[in-house]
Amino acid sequence: MTRKLEIPESRDLPDWSHIGGGKVRELYVHRQYKNILLMFASNRVSAFDFVLEPEIPEKGRMLTQMSNWWFRKLPAENHLLENYDQELYRDLASHIPSHILERSTICRKMDIIPFEFVIRGYLTGSAWADYLENNTVYGIKLKGKFRQGDRLPGPIFTPTTKSRTKDTPVRYEDLVNAIGLSHAQQLREMCTDYYTTAEQIARNKGLIIADAKFEFGIAEGKVYLADELLTADSARYWDINSWGQFDLPIERRLDSFDKQAVRDWVKCNSGKNITPQNITPLRLPQELIQTVYKKYKTLLAKLTG
């Protein structure tokens, strides 16, 4: 079955050429300024590298707002055009319909570093699975005993491949071989600093950032934050009060403001193996869509309110 993807009409973006897209976003280049891109965030939802139906209402707008909020909060140079040329940004934005602009990021074109950089501050997800099996977190031995959801002694840098299918962990030594020691050290320091700063900001908002994914690009020899930043799709958020209540069931203590409920539902309804044949016919129930929508909406309000 072929799915119809949500893509803005060409008449709404006459100054832009569509050059590609992924599971949840579409990418455009400006017809005159070839070094300027527009990333459009759709309402599509994916799990296990498959796009599912139906879409989540307002998802693109909410995640774009989260990302832009963090780009302005963190003391980091990033790919946003408005930070580089405000006059050009205002001119380009003025020709984009508001219903598209609110879900779009206008940015400078960069050479994207072909890795994703995950920072883990708490023992959860694949880090917890690794700890249970090997008593390590991606090769790092932890001293003492830890429970699921515990704060780690310090943020752990765990890069992965950047793939259209399944991302796989990358050893630091292999990262050095791929991009050089200087860039590897710089990116590890940047990720650790950005995560530490963001986690403190989030804590002041009543939230915990358990882990987060960062992406970077290079322009004119400098490294910049790129892609989306600390959205509900690229970071794992918990409620700080629930996290601290150890008498609660673990699924309530570590209930995250993201699409984990979608992943759990797919696991339960796709049989033993998560394959295209098993996932494609699935249609997410409306109750689940509303649950995820409310999580995104609550997170956005907590962060920006």
UniProtKB/Swiss-Prot annotation:
Example GO biological process: 'de novo' IMP biosynthetic process
Catalyzed chemical reaction(s)? 5-amino-1-(5-phospho-D-ribosyl)imidazole-4-carboxylate + L-aspartate + ATP = (2S)-2-[5-amino-1-(5-phospho-beta-D-ribosyl)imidazole-4-carboxamido]succinate + ADP + phosphate + 2 H(+)
Return one GO MF term: ATP binding
Q: What is its EC number?
A: 6.3.2.6
List cellular component terms (GO). cytoplasm
InterPro entries noted in UniProt: SAICAR_synt/ADE2_N (IPR028923), SAICAR_synthetase_CS (IPR018236)
Q: Kindly tell me the pathway this chain contributes to.
A: Purine metabolism; IMP biosynthesis via de novo pathway; 5-amino-1-(5-phospho-D-ribosyl)imidazole-4-carboxamide from 5-amino-1-(5-phospho-D-ribosyl)imidazole-4-carboxylate: step 1/2
Q: Which Pfam families match?
A: SAICAR_synt (PF01259)
Highest taxon in the source lineage: Bacteria
Q: Which UniProt keywords apply?
A: ATP-binding, Ligase, Nucleotide-binding, Purine biosynthesis
Q: What family is this protein classified in?
A: Belongs to the SAICAR synthetase family.
This chain's protein is named Phosphoribosylaminoimidazole-succinocarboxamide synthase
Question: Which gene is transcribed and translated to give this protein?
Answer: purC
